Swiss-Prot record:
One example GO MF annotation: RNA polymerase II cis-regulatory region sequence-specific DNA binding
Cited function: Testis-specific DNA binding protein responsible for insulator function, nuclear architecture and transcriptional control, which probably acts by recruiting epigenetic chromatin modifiers. Plays a key role in gene imprinting in male germline, by participating in the establishment of differential methylation at the IGF2/H19 imprinted control region (ICR). Directly binds the unmethylated H19 ICR and recruits the PRMT7 methyltransferase, leading to methylate histone H4 'Arg-3' to form H4R3sme2. This probably leads to recruit de novo DNA methyltransferases at these sites.
Renumbered residue ranges of the record's region Disordered: 24-55, 221-250, 569-630
Protein name per its UniProtKB record: Transcriptional repressor CTCFL
Amino acid sequence: MAATEISVLSEQFTKIKELELMPEKGLKEEEKDGVCREKDHRSPSELEAERTSGAFQDSVLEEEVELVLAPSEESEKYILTLQTVHFTSEAVELQDMSLLSIQQQEGVQVVVQQPGPGLLWLEEGPRQSLQQCVAISIQQELYSPQEMEVLQFHALEENVMVASEDSKLAVSLAETTGLIKLEEEQEKNQLLAERTKEQLFFVETMSGDERSDEIVLTVSNSNVEEQEDQPTAGQADAEKAKSTKNQRKTKGAKGTFHCDVCMFTSSRMSSFNRHMKTHTSEKPHLCHLCLKTFRTVTLLRNHVNTHTGTRPYKCNDCNMAFVTSGELVRHRRYKHTHEKPFKCSMCKYASVEASKLKRHVRSHTGERPFQCCQCSYASRDTYKLKRHMRTHSGEKPYECHICHTRFTQSGTMKIHILQKHGENVPKYQCPHCATIIARKSDLRVHMRNLHAYSAAELKCRYCSAVFHERYALIQHQKTHKNEKRFKCKHCSYACKQERHMTAHIRTHTGEKPFTCLSCNKCFRQKQLLNAHFRKYHDANFIPTVYKCSKCGKGFSRWINLHRHSEKCGSGEAKSAASGKGRRTRKRKQTILKEATKGQKEAAKGWKEAANGDEAAAEEASTTKGEQFPGEMFPVACRETTARVKEEVDEGVTCEMLLNTMDK
């Protein structure tokens, strides 16, 4: 039969090529380059044979394929094994395999050797999955094995027409009974399955026989079941191409995304999504080391790097490395490039960071959005507000490691260490003024801020004077400090500094913004809060005792010691340190003044008595006794009236009279 006739053509090969379907036309021969091509129509017998060739049915191609004889050429050949695999689309995992789409490629020629008993065979398997293997030899010069991944294979469809130079012989696959044996049930199942399946090809390359230089390419013909609700492959490709085109148009349009919560806008979707997470309290990313949560994976990764000490972002200009890319960019701008991309539109100010530009713009607008919840203080940035809140809480987180003095600011602590404990620290003097600074970097900042020429006019806060140098402005404003410019609206109090007026106003309003965190007691001044905290809540506090060098008496306050030292050793009454002693001293002074006044009146009476008006003197003495019963003179004093008269005439003083009374 066909097998014997094909065996005669041992040195010929067949070429499979996709042909366009041409209905209502007969056979037509074309000769080109010595190859005969022929198109035909299907006959009823061929349609019957189509059912028996179910293993070669392809639902993807709807065109006819012809098998044409051509001269053979001697070259290296490669064996291709075609396998048909049945599985559903849900179970398909396209890993390490190449999907071959079905499209026409004229530059590829697939050559099939003359079929023989060992060339084309069928292995019978389960009824549900029928496997077929076809060995195909491809010439290397026509198509290299390395390009097989993109090779497009066309499955045999229906009957195959085999033509020779002398005669035309139609060979049906159904007639090759020696090569293919199909059971009727398997044919029906496969025909039904192929109508609802999509055919995919997968190519695998492996070495051939050790004795030959052949490479075996395994081509898997996979039938994938299509879902009813899914579109066809052509529709899917069209929709995909359309969506890709629309995405490109959208991308080219560069639309702007606006936040509905705030005024944020961005031209990038990723930046907009990242911003929207700031308005939600959701933090799904958890650090496994400290259990801190973060909004994004990037923030979590940067945080974990702080635990591990990893610094993945390295500077190309120096040896420094950083945890985040933002720190690296900021470092390069400050140290290497000196770039200041953020510029103010109202003046010539430029900054390395956007946050500093925002803070600077508030100096033009006067905006102070960060308000203290305990007083009227407001700041342009959060850092100064946090620093201000320490004045209410009394917190001093920075401690000097030498004398253990605590400070609210790190800068104040550094200056303290340099000035108080830096004996051998070099000093830098400003060439424009008498300022001496411990650090060279601070000297540069001082000269830039105070002595640099400013194109903008700097106006005095107290008058209409204008300057172009900040140092000159400060020196001018000091001339206004001797004035008591701040006057109280409620009384006649006036002061030189605004902070003094603020503290005074609290005496009228009753405001006590400084609260003790331990006992909730409130104070008008911060100094009173600090003294209260040290005295009652600090276990390590040792009160300072101020001792008098003359009498050795101790005082808790220096002012009390100063008052005492003025009177100590003069024979006068010694002042007490406590509040009770002060009240007693004031009461005694009041009594002494009243006694002095009464004594003057008594002296006047005695003078009148010395002149012969005895009755007037007794009346004056009686009046004085009624006013000050505790200071009544004894009767014996009347005997010394003449002597007192002489002393009064000589200009007696009150102190002399009191000394006389003591005697």
